[in-house]
Amino acid sequence: AVLDRVSNMTREIQEKVSRRAIVFPTGFELKQGMIQDTNTPFLKHELEERGYYVTVGEVMEDNVEDVVEKLDDALSQGFGLIVTTGGVGAEDKDHSVEGVCRMDPTAATPYIVKFQQGTGRHVKDGVRIGVGVVGPSRMVALPGPHDEVMCAAPVLLRGLEENWDKETLADRLAAALADKWRRKGMGQPHHHNRGQEKG
């Protein structure tokens, strides 16, 4: 009977962990109050509707050390879901995906769009998202634009509900976001440009 009680408690703790979420906004502009954060309230509401207990994290700085520190802190506090929005673009100062990879070296980081190297302000070769897992905790690095977060949210929620592995969740998020980029007519969506580069 004691063992049953212990396994029930373990299950309850795991259930509680998986339902505790923290959402981190990222970026210098938010910290300075130059732009309003619409993503965090939106994600908080969507997750709470589905029974999550959501904490709003501090704004992450535009450096990978700060991202790593805040992710590490959230992991040690037992959050089952850690979401960052912003900081996944192609400019050099975007560090969310790198932070997730430091925590989980096998994180899934598919591209949502590819650029010609060295065009405009883009230093990297495209925009990636990241999904990593450490113990019972899942980390998801989403883009910053609010329309992209709105596009990703239903996929994220379904993936959590159906307990997809990190590769599946990352690929399906990337597919939805690549489609959105294609409709915006920006860049070349990664999923559809293999072997059929435009001449």
Language model region names:
Residues 5-62, 66:
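Glycine-rich phosphate/diphosphate-binding loop of Rossmann-like nucleotide-binding domains
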